From Swiss-Prot:
PANTHER family: PHOSPHO-2-DEHYDRO-3-DEOXYHEPTONATE ALDOLASE DAHP SYNTHETASE, PHOSPHO-2-DEHYDRO-3-DEOXYHEPTONATE ALDOLASE, TRP-SENSITIVE. It comes from Escherichia coli O6:H1 (strain CFT073 / ATCC 700928 / UPEC). The keyword Transcription does not apply. This is Phospho-2-dehydro-3-deoxyheptonate aldolase, Trp-sensitive. It holds the Pfam family DAHP_synth_1.
């Protein structure tokens, strides 16, 4: 009989289960309390109960655990310095959506060479998240793959659904199940309505099919996530200006949703010129000083060293520099955070 299935499958390998990985890298009581408390603080900011600003900042993607931990240690110092004005959360992105092809992140390809040692990538990701949370720094990530979240979601304080997946039904259903607040980016064309629709969908109960922590295929029924919000990330043109934010809030108001959002300084808002994140910061700070309460948080891409680099076989990588989108360096990061804290002073 002719085969009719898996005709294009090149490789199948056993995957560790989320339960097995959690046994190897368990959540400690201290980390569990830290994650729970961090989520609650973020929820209060998104609801307008806390006047502080949510600051989600870090490398475009994680590829080097040593550099990531050095960044986290420095970020913890900034958290301590500005905790009365800012809720600083580290961007820990392990999955990268690609427009066509490219490196898809630490979990998929931890060795950066196309070997796809996913089990090792999952171990590295969970290990790093535990270490960063143990420092006292909350973590944020994008939930891209429908299975990967099962391995790390218990260590995440804030999640994102990206511009390419906000319109996806299954991602909206997944967001309705997540235990952390979830931001939905506007579409790559700048369309914010799809993010509003995603927020509405994620608030509802859904049923979807998914493996559980033990790898058993199950039917999941969710209760809905009340902490969805828009991430203004720009599109063909920036959308961080006051009139753009007002228009987004009008749409939120139309559907009786909280008029609080997050502004992404990078991506379409900086028109892929990483130093323009500083210009976006200046504009957002002025809006805050002018009395804007809609801006609940910001996102920015920064690392130890400015810019980006390409992966070249046989050549060492520059320590602390991005291998995906270009990032601000550490000195600019300190200046950016200081400016945000100063602007938020006017809310008190």
């Amino acid at each position: 009989m002719n085969r009719t299935d898996e005709l294009r499958t090149a490789r199948i390998e056993s995957l560790v289960t989320p339960a097995e990985l959690a046994l190897r890298y368990p959540v400690t009581p201290g980390v569990a309390t830290h994650v729970t408390d961090s989520r609650r603080r973020i929820e209060k900011i998104l609801n307008g109960e806390d006047k502080r600003l949510l600051v989600i900042i870090g490398p475009c993607s994680i590829h080097d655990l040593t550099a990531a931990m050095e960044y986290a240690t420095r970020l913890q110092s900034l958290r301590n310095q500005y905790q009365s004005r800012l809720e600083i959360v580290m961007r820990t992105y392990f999955e990268k959506p690609r427009t066509v092809v490219g490196w898809k992140g630490l979990i998929s390809d931890p060795d950066l060479n196309g070997s796809y040692r996913v089990n090792h990538g999952l171990e590295l990701a969970r290990k790093l998240l535990l270490q960063v949370n143990e420092l006292g720094v909350p973590t944020a990530t994008e939930f891209l793959d429908m299975v990967t979240g099962q391995f790390i979601a218990d260590l995440i304080s804030w999640g994102a659904i990206g511009a390419r997946t906000t319109e996806s039904q299954i991602h909206r259903e997944m967001a309705s199940a997540l235990s952390c607040p979830v931001g939905f980016k506007n579409g790559t064309d700048g369309n914010t309505r799809i993010a509003v629709d995603a927020i509405r969908a994620a608030r509802a109960s859904h049923m979807f099919l998914s493996p559980d922590k033990n790898g058993q295929m199950t039917i999941y029924q969710t209760s809905g996530n009340p902490y969805g919000h828009i991430i203004m990330r720009g599109g063909k043109k920036p959308n961080y200006h006051a009139d753009d934010i007002a228009a987004a809030c009008d749409t939120l108001h139309e559907f009786d949703l909280p008029e609080h959002l997050v502004v992404d300084f990078s991506h379409g808002n900086c028109q892929k010129q990483h130093r323009r994140q500083l210009e976006v910061c200046e504009d957002i700070c002025q809006q805050i000083r002018n009395g804007s309460t809609a801006i609940a948080g910001i996102m920015a891409e920064s690392f130890l060293r400015e810019g980006t680099q390409k992966i070249v076989g046989g050549q060492p990588l520059t320590y602390g520099q991005s291998i995906t989108d270009p990032c601000l360096g550490w000195e600019d990061t300190e200046r950016l955070v200081e400016k945000l804290a100063s602007a938020v002073d006017t809310r008190f």
